[in-house]
Amino acid sequence: MRRQVMNSGARPTATPSTIIAPISGLNIRDPLANMQSRYALVLDNFFPRASDLQLRKGYVLYSSCYDIDKKDRPPFVRLLSYAPATYKGNCLFAVSDEGFIKLDTNKNTAPVLKIDSPATNGLWQSVNFSNGGGDWLWCCCGDGVNKARVYDGTKWTILDSASTPALDYSTEWVDVCSFKRRLWLARRNSDVLYYLDVLAIAGVEKKENTTLYSLPLGSLWNRGGSIIKIMNLTLDSGSGADDYLCIFSTEGQVAVYKGNNPNNDNDWGLVGIYDIPKPLSANCFIKYGGDIILMTENGLLAFSEMFQTIEIKHSIMSSAIIHNAWLEAVDRLRLIGKEKGLTLQQVGQYCSLCLYGEQNMLICNFLHDFRSDGETGAYIQYVLNTESRAWCRFKDLHMSAFTNHRDSVYCVADRYFYKFWEGYTDNKNFITAIMKTAYMFPSGRGTNSRITLIRPTFQTQILDVKYSLVIDSDYKELQRLRTPRTMAVSPLGIWDEAIWDDAFWVGTPRVSQDWTTINHYIGKAISLRLKVAAKGQDIALVGFDLITQSGGMI
C-alpha cells in the first residue's frame, strides 16, 4: 500500500529571488548599509528608464571640419542653433577661436572648412529673435575684442556704432535675452542691465533720442558682483501665467522683475532679490518648460523652487542624490582653473546644459581635463531623467558642446560634427557600460549568503549580449570585471525556414536569460557589478534572478 511521504520540515538550502534593475538611478548620498535596492552605486553609460536600464546610444559623424593642412586649428567650443519661424534656412553654427562655421544637418555632408563670420574667441552667447523685419540669431561674446553680430538666414551683420542700425559697446556684451518683445543685454564686468526698444535689434545710448536704456542693479545686490545671465521665468500663480525677468549675478544673487514696459513705473516693478549658489557660467543655464535650470557650484538648481520658497533647502535641488559627485566635478574645474590661471566661472564657460525632451534627458556636460592646442578636452556628463528624476553618468563622450536643434541633439568634438543618440556605436566604436547595484541582504541582515546561480535578464534585438559579472561582498571590491563574455539569445527567424509562432523576427525585442554559476566571497551584504560591451545593438537590462544559499551569522 502506497503511503504519502511525510515532509521532514527541513529548511530549504537554496531560495530564489528576483532583483529589478536599479531604475531609480545613481545614488551617492545614502549610507551603503541602508540604501534601497532600486538605486545604483555606479551607473556609467546606462540610462535609467521607467522599467529598465538602457545602454546609452551613440553618435555618428555628420561632417568633418578638419583641415589636414592646418592640424593646429582650434576646436569647436559652441554650437549655436538658428531656428527661424519657418523651417527654411534653419542651421547650426559651430564656433571656435577662428569664428563661425555653418553646419548642415543633412547626413553625410561634405567636409566644411569655410569661416562664415571670423572671430578670435569661441565663447559666445546667442538668442533667436523675430521682429517682423526678419528672423535673427543675435550673438555676443563680450571679450572686449569681438563685436556683437546678427545672422538673418543668409548673411552676418556686425553691429557697432557705425552699423545700421547702430549698437554701442559692441565688444562688451556678455549675454542677451528676449523678454516682452525686447532684447535685454548684460555688459562685461557691469551690474547695469541694458535693454532696447520694442522689436529693435540695436540701439545707442545718448542724451537725446536714446534707444539703449540702462537699469542699475548694484544697489540691490549686497554680495556685489556683475551680471552673468539674463533669463525669463514663467509661472502659473493660480490666476494665469506670469512672466518674470530674472537677472543673475556672478556672486549668486537674482533680481526678479515683473511688467511690460521698464520705461513706465506703473507697468514695471521689482519682485524681489533671491540668494542662490554661484552659477558655474553663463553657458550653464537652460529653459525647461517655463522654469530656469542652472548648474551651480553646489548642484543643479530649478530656480522656480527657490522663487516660490522662503528658505533654501538642500533637498529641493535636483542633484542632491549625487551631491558628492557634483562637488568632485566642480573641484576638478577649480583645479583646472588653478593650473591655467582662470577663475571657476571662466573654466565653467566650457561646461554646458542640454535638454533632450524626446528622451526625457537633461545633460550636464562637465569639463574634466583642459584641452591642448587643437584638441577638445576630456568631458563627463551627469544625466538626469527629467520624468523619473533618476541620475546616471555618461563616459567616453568627449564633446565640448551639445545642442538641441529641431528635436535632435548634435554635438562637436575637436573639429568634428556629430549627431547624438543615433545608432548603437560611438562613431563605429564599442559602447561600454558599467553598473553596480546597492548592497542588499539576500538572507536577511546579519546572515551570510552565497549566490550559487545567477541569471541576468536583457532585452535586445539583433546580436548576442557581451557581459561580465562579479559579486562584491560586505562593501569590498575584491574582484575585477573581466572582458565581457557572450550570452546567447534566441535565433532570428528566417522566412520559409523558421517555425511560425516560435521564432523571433528581426526587429522584435528578445529576452536574453542564461543561468550561470558565479564565484564570490561569502558575505552578509551583496552587490552585483555588471559590465556590458556592445557595438551595433540596442540593449536594456531588466533585472536579475538569484539562487541563494543561507549560512550562519559568522
Label every PLM stretch briefly.
Residues 1-112, 172-257, 335-384, 416:
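N-terminal beta-propeller domains
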Residues 6, 127-129, 405-406, 477-526:
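Leucine-centric amphipathic alpha-helical interface motifs
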Residues 72-83, 119-132, 166-178, 227-231, ...:
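Repeated scaffold domains used in trafficking and secretory/extracellular systems
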Residues 107-112, 155-158, 202-211, 262-271, ...:
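Beta-strand initiation motifs
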Residues 127-162, 167-169, 173-176, 182-185:
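Hydrophobic or amphipathic alpha-helical targeting/insertion segments
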Residues 232-428:
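Beta-sheet-dominated scaffold domains
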Residues 425-461, 523-525, 531-554:
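Exposed low-complexity, polar/acidic, P/S/T/G-rich flexible segments that act as propeptides
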Residues 465-473:
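Short, surface-exposed beta-strand/strand-loop-strand elements in extracellular ectodomains
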